[in-house]
């Protein structure tokens, strides 16, 4: 099977590659990858090349496919797997394999990654339960289940304690105060959505950022009124220009501090502020992954000793987290499409990945069978003045107030002849 992929060849070197995949073994799957959402972790891998802990050596001869937030259709089933998988079955990938090597789809494999028209899912991933059935018809929601899974995993990884009881109570504190720092970006939107609509029921959620445009968009998508209807006080705060942001944020809790603080940017000042915001028994979740292996920030160990403050760090999520993300998206309880601001084809991946931190907006969604520059949804109408493709896409997203949706996805895929039925 001939495939077209975006692959890492070295530091800051991502290219489109076309080649013949080998035949699958009796314990492998050949799949068509319909969609993949671009993760900042992919930029980190492309930035570092083989110096990244998950990226192997010899990229020049064995480049690795980028992308891991993907969904698609099974095309061919190895003969030992026919009792479990069927041709034409839709799937979503759980990329958190948990291997001692750290190897994972989108970082480590020449034939296994989300930015590909076709890929081979290896036996190790299948045995680890990484291929999850997807019964929906909206591929974007399936791709976005992976970032939502990471968000859910972070909420589940937080913990709290009782003095002299040597068992952790997992999860955020029920009825507690949550602070979401640097959290009005694409992943932040998902974190706010889950805090309000995921059933965890905090009493107060404070969303902090220094980008007013992002905060305005977050307020529009997840309004204060919606949270209030669920008994949750939602507060958006721009700390830019504040002389003492930690003090002003603590004042929102009458000085008590926050039970759970999530850090969504690997910025020393943000991490230091997170430490300052912790209540007694407060849990700081360092969600953002730094590129610097020597990233160090001062921490108040007086509070660790006397106030039982503590830190966790999370990367990825469990299969259970992924299943929860899929289920909550399917019922409409969560809206992962809120995170999407740009759409593009496979040809757009190299530039998108290499410049990701500099591209404004939220998640960038790639359709591998499509040829299309990365385009902001807000630009569809303007481009539609001269291009009928964008004219119709603009009309379709207008139905959902500028949010990417299944109708728009189906139209786009149809224009490029992408098979979303039983792939052949």
Question: What are these model-predicted stretches?
Answer:
Residues 1-66, 400-424:
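Short N-terminal strand-loop motif that marks the start
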Residues 22-37, 51-100, 113, 125, ...:
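Glycine-rich beta-strand-centered segment in the early N-terminal region that forms part
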Residues 95-177:
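NAD(P)H dinucleotide-binding glycine-rich loop of Rossmann-like/cofactor-binding domains
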Residues 162, 243-248, 269-276, 320-424:
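C-terminal hydrophobic helical "lid"/dimerization subdomain
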Residues 175-176, 181, 192-270, 393:
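Adenosine-nucleotide cofactor-binding segment
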Residues 186-187, 214:
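Hydrophobic/small residue at the entry helix of a nucleotide-binding pocket
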Residues 269-272, 276, 288-308:
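Rossmann-fold NAD(P)-binding glycine/threonine-rich loop
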Residues 278-280:
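Helix-to-beta-strand junctions that scaffold the AdoMet/dcAdoMet cofactor pocket
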